[in-house]
Amino acid sequence: MTNYFESPFKGKLLTEQVKNPNIKVGRYSYYSGYYHGHSFDDCARYLLPDRDDVDQLIIGSFCSIGSGAAFIMAGNQGHRYDWVSSFPFFYMNEEPAFAKSVDAFQRAGDTVIGSDVWIGSEAMIMPGIKIGHGAVIGSRALVAKDVEPYTIVGGNPAKSIRKRFSEEEISMLLDMAWWDWPLEQIKEAMPFLCSSGIASLYRRWQGTSA
């Protein structure tokens, strides 16, 4: 099978890959999938991608997504563990014995990934999860609960390891929301973005936005 990626050292922007209308992506977010060989569309695990009522995968800007990351979509995918059987009879209703089966599909709500989020290789995000801006998801983490902004999580199930910055610094970053700035403003702020000088960037931003 031909590898969708030419090199393990360079990802591709999601805007260049995504064809599924249920996946919404921001600017400059990328997927580096060389070691798994497929485009980002295959990272979103939909049961029926053309259904009108499926949950959406919404990804912000400037996100970094490692090879083999998976987003489990389409709600419960037709399995009801509160019924006698979790088997999805409805999706095999061409079988006469299953003709009276009921569609067990339930939405979980949209999966929303904030901006400037780093998702490690082979991490798995469960349905309906919300991941805050600036979060870091460790490789092979199984994320079954929402993740707060600028929080590093890892493990199975994923648990909080630590915050990236102090609460005051996180408040500054969320207030600035640099990922929404025009490119020219980002260009001018690049020396600050590539440093740990959050307070300095915040003071500069306050001066330009006054």
Swiss-Prot record:
Gene3D superfamilies membership: Hexapeptide repeat proteins
Q: Which GO terms describe its biological process?
A: response to antibiotic
Question: Any idea what this protein is called?
Answer: Chloramphenicol acetyltransferase
Please name the InterPro entries in this protein's record.
Hexapep, Hexapep_transf_CS, Trans_hexapeptide_repeat, Trimer_LpxA-like_sf
Tell whether Transferase is among the UniProt keywords. yes
Instruction: Supply the NCBIfam families for this chain.
Output: chloram_CatB
Name the EC number(s).
Answer: 2.3.1.28
Q: What does this protein do?
A: This enzyme is an effector of chloramphenicol resistance in bacteria.
Q: Which reaction does it catalyse?
A: chloramphenicol + acetyl-CoA = chloramphenicol 3-acetate + CoA
Per the UniProt record, the lineage of the source organism begins with: Bacteria, Pseudomonadati, Pseudomonadota, Gammaproteobacteria, Enterobacterales
PANTHER family named among the record's database cross-references = ACETYLTRANSFERASE, CHLORAMPHENICOL ACETYLTRANSFERASE
PROSITE patterns assigned to the protein according to its UniProt record, in alphabetical order: HEXAPEP_TRANSFERASES
